[in-house]
Every structure is written in structure tokens, then in C-alpha cells.
Amino acid sequence: MSSSLFILDENLEPLVSKNIRALPNLSSVLSSFKQCYHDGSPPILSQNDWFFIHLKRDFLHFVSVIHTTDKPNIDLMTILAFLEQFYHLLQKYFEIEVLTKNVILDNILLVLELIDECIDFGIVQVTDPSIIKDYIRVKVNVPRVTVDNEEWSPGEESSSSSGSDSDSEYSNTNKRKDKKKKRKKKKGTKGKSVGKSKLKSIMVNNKENRGINVVETVKETLRNKNDTGKEAANDELPNDGNDLYINGDIAKTIIMPISWRTKGIHYAKNEFFLDVIERVQYLMDFEKGVIRKNLIHGEIVCRCYLSGMPKLKISINKILNRDPQFMSNSSFHQCVSLDSINTIEKDEEKNSDDDAGLQAATDAREIEFIPPDGEFVLCQYELKRHVKDAPMVRLKDFEIKPKLKKFKIQIVTKIQTNFKPTNSTSKLNVRIPLTKVFQEYKIDLSKQIRFKANIGKVVFNLSDDFLLWEIQTMKGHREHSTNKSSQYNSDEDDPNTCASMVAEFPLFNQEEYDRLQEEMKTSMNPPPLRTGPRLEELYRQVHDQQTSHVTPRDKLVNIDFEIPYCTCSGLKVEYLKVEEPQLQYQSFPWVRYKTVSDEEYAYIV
């Protein structure tokens, strides 16, 4: 059992501390953790009869303290998993991607309330955001700035910038649903079912963000339904404060077998969104031709807006084909029941000689689950690609061509896609490092730098020394070459099927510089007028205080892409069924696919 819980900043200074077991001196316990902690420490440390389970996320440290006498009665990995889930819970509440020190300090009371609900006397209870949000309804204190008569918060920016345009459709859908619910409440209609016989409610009163006053009121109302299904006017909740009341079935949910979904959920339009997102991790030594990493990190993200207690059935081709790598390296949400798959394996062994029985078992191989309300991750998996499998976007050629006689240097890059011609990228950016070029050659930034591209555009980052080639849309099996002046000797180099870009940097000419200086001394004419920014002065100011060594990152050509309607592993959802035997409503399931590059998708040059 956890004795205490800390949230520390990056300097290991306490932001929030919760003394669960009434320890006499928390400061001495924290000082023991500071003594044994260092960069690169394992997640579990021991010092002075104390065990410290710590987790670093963003700019914060989450630390749980356990005494040695309690260690035999608790699983340390369970506490580590709890810290991870608690971090995601804070993200859901604050609606931001990165937790900072200021956000925690501005919401200390809310964080303490969340700790009390998640853990009871050191024992983990529940960390599901959809359940806890119905218990603790507190307005989050986040900074807001008025821009063009509209309020803006950091969470709104992170949610809109991190996702694509398709992800913003979901947020817009939620906003439209909230507006519809508010209109219905104003008209006097019922927005959410609150049980059959009795209603237990908790009213949360938070005035001017000065404190949290929780007033518990218990109201019992009889709901008599007539043949038309309408309720009496006296049974309706007040329209102005419906958001302050919670469903009475929530308290029973956490002790029921289906603890991730409450009863009494109702939506006017029943929809279910399923996204298959695969992140490709690829690292290759371009000079040696050795592939160091070639992995696929996939996840199935769902957004559920269904009424009642629906039962979903999903069939995936990887399960139908009994892919051993997928089955051994995949993890599912707690709502998924894998009993049907295990039963099918037994039926296949029994009916191995019976073709009809084997076909029936194959048709019935599916995932069955009752989804939680809102957004959740249904499945996570990791697959290894074969060495001979071509990457989705391949660096075909990278060459630095110095032309010393002309005092110029050219950088040539070729990339090639390897997916279906019917698909195309919605985003494609190539990051070309220049640190090595600026160290080995003396670049003259006083002269004009030339870029030529018949597709996309090229941006020169002066402070970080790299070129960013923004291509955006590119169809499958189409090659882009950065050397337009080269001779095309094959079909692959046909200018009709190739796009080119060339970056040319001028080299410093000492003889020309001395000659111009002598002419300026003897000439009566003023120096020529120069317009535009002086890049050489800006570069000198930026790089004067920086070290001049080449880091491993400066040798990587990074490729950032996004391919909608495509999966690298070939995973496909065969069908998706929604069944609700009591309500029997019409549902609208949606399935999408997307392949994106991981943070490490690069070539070592």
C-alpha cells in the first residue's frame, strides 16, 4: 500500500503531496528520494527502509512511497501502472497534451480530489476518466486569452494542432451535440435518462473559482411513464442546473462487472467512430545500407456515442488469419472479452476434420465488448517488418556535391514512395541537416541562396541549420528528385513522373572579397545598396554562443508524413456490428485508417 504520493517539478521540488498513511515527517522521506535519484535511475528505488516508485512525464515527477513492511502485500508494478494512469487522467481533466508546473499549481484542490477518488488508504480504486468525471465536476482553472472575441486556451490549441483535420471533425461533432442538448433542455425535453425509480444526485458548487464546496443532496422522485413514454412535468430536472446533477447509477458502476460504463446514457444520434492509426518507426544507415529499426506501433482508437448498454462485434483480418505476431504483441482494453477467440481455438481443434465446423468457427472469430462512453483505446499492437519490405517513404539518394571551381555547393536528395497509387500523402516533409556542411565548408550567406522546386517549397532554418522541404501531397509510387539539371536516362527519371528540388549555397571566395575591398578603397562611388536581411550577421549572432560539434541528430534526414486511408501492416476491419437488444436503435459506425511516421523515421547520412 502506498504511504504517500508526491508530484514534483523538474527540480524535484514538491508541488502536491498527499500523506495517505499519516507519516510523521514527509520532508525526510522526500529528502531520501532526492539522495538516491539521478538521471537515468530505474523506476523503482530503495533508500532508508523506503521504496520509491517514480515516473517522469513531461516536466513532472510522479512518486509513490511504500514502506518495506508493506512490500510483501503489494505489487510494485501495480503502483507504477497506477502512476501512468493517473498521469493520463490529469491530461483528460485539463484537456492538454503537456502537463506543466503552473497547471498543477492552479488546480491543487482538483488534483487532491482526484487522488482521493483514485486511491483509498493506499489501495488503488478506479482511474477511469469517464467514471471519475461524473463524480468530480469542477471547472478547470486554465489561462484563457480573448482573441477576436473568442476565448482561447492551451488545451484547445494542443487538441487542434496535434490532430489532423479529420480529428477536428470529431470535436466539432461533440460541440454540435452539446448545443443540441442545450436546446432540448430549454424546450423542456429530457437529455439524459437518470434511472427508473430513484435519483441520487450530488451537486457541485464552484463559485468564482475560489474553492470547491460539495453539497450532497438526495432527492427521491417517482417517474410514472404512460403509454406514450412521456413523463410528468413535476419529474423533470431544473433546466438551468442539469449539468450539476449526476446519474444515481454511477455509484453502483464501480462495483459491477461492467465498471467502465454507467447505465442511463442517452444520445439523440448514436454513432461509433473507430480509427486505426499506425506509426512507422524506421532507422537506416544510408551509407552502409543497414536497417537498424523497422517497426509498426499501431493502436485502434474509438469514440463511442451510443445509448444504453450496446454490445459491439468487430472482426479484424489479423485475427481471422490467426497472425501469430499480432496475437502475441497486442493488448486490448479491459472491456474486450477474448473468451470467444479462445472458444474458437478449441472448436478448431475439435472440428479440424469437419470443413463445415471449421468454416463456422472462422466466421465467428470476432471481438466482442461493451464499450465505455467517450474516447478510449481499444487495442495496441507492435509488429516487426521484414528487412526486405520497402519503407513507406524511401530516401533513394542523398549527395552533397561541392563545386569548388565555381565556389558553389549543391545538396541533392531523392525520395520515393512505396504504397498504392490510389493513395496519397496528406503531409510530407523532409528535413535535411546542414550542420556538417557549414562546418566543413565556408558558406557565404551574404550572397543569395537558390532553391528550385517544381513541387512544394523549401525553407531554410537559420538557427537550427536545416532545410525543410514541404511537399504535402504526393501519390504512391512517384519519385521526387532534387536534381533537375541532371540527365534522365531511365523511366524513373522521366520529368513527367519526377519532381525536383535543388539547393545551392555559395562558398566564400577570398580573392573576390579582397578585390572588392580594394575597389571600394579607390572608388568614389558609394557601395551598392543592399536590401533584405543580412543573413551572415544573423547567423553569427545565433551561433556565437553555440558549440561547434556535430551531434547524432545532425546526421539524420528526417521524413515526416501522413497517409490517410492506408495501413502499413495491412490490418483491416472486416465488419463492425452494434447491437442493443433493449433500445434497438439505428446506429452509425464509422471506420478510418491512417499511417503516420513515428518520431524516429530517419536515415543516417
Swiss-Prot record:
Location of region: Disordered: 150-196
Membrane topology, record value: Peripheral membrane protein
Extra facts: Present with 2890 molecules/cell in log phase SD medium.
Main localization (coarse): Golgi
Bias-annotated ranges (Low complexity): 155-171
CDD domains: AP-1_Mu1_Cterm (cd09250), AP_Mu_N (cd14828)
Organism: Saccharomyces cerevisiae (strain ATCC 204508 / S288c) (Baker's yeast)
GO cellular component, one term: trans-Golgi network
Molecular function via GO: clathrin adaptor activity
Record keywords, A-Z: Cytoplasmic vesicle, Endosome, Golgi apparatus, Membrane, Protein transport, Transport
Role noted for this protein: Component of the AP-1-related (AP-1R) complex, an adapter protein complex that mediates of cargo protein sorting in clathrin-coated vesicles. AP-1R has a specific role in SNARE SNC1 sorting. In contrast to the APM1-containing AP-1 complex, AP-1R is incapable of sorting CHS3.
Pfam families: Adap_comp_sub (PF00928)
MHD domain: residues covered: 269-604
Subcellular location per the Swiss-Prot or TrEMBL entry: Golgi apparatus membrane; Early endosome membrane; Cytoplasmic vesicle, Clathrin-coated vesicle membrane
Description of the deletion phenotype: Leads to sensitivity to cationic amphiphilic drugs (CADs) such as sertraline.
Assembly and oligomerization: Component of the AP-1R complex composed of at least APM2, APL4 and APS1. Interacts with MIL1. Interacts with APL2.
Keyword RNA-binding among record annotations: no
Similarity section: Belongs to the adaptor complexes medium subunit family.
Protein name per the record: Adaptin medium chain homolog APM2
Cited InterPro entries: Adaptor_comp_med_subunit, AP2_Mu_C_sf, Apm2_N, Clathrin_mu_CS, Longin-like_dom_sf, MHD
UniProt record, GO biological process: Golgi to vacuole transport; intracellular protein transport; vesicle targeting, trans-Golgi to endosome; vesicle-mediated transport
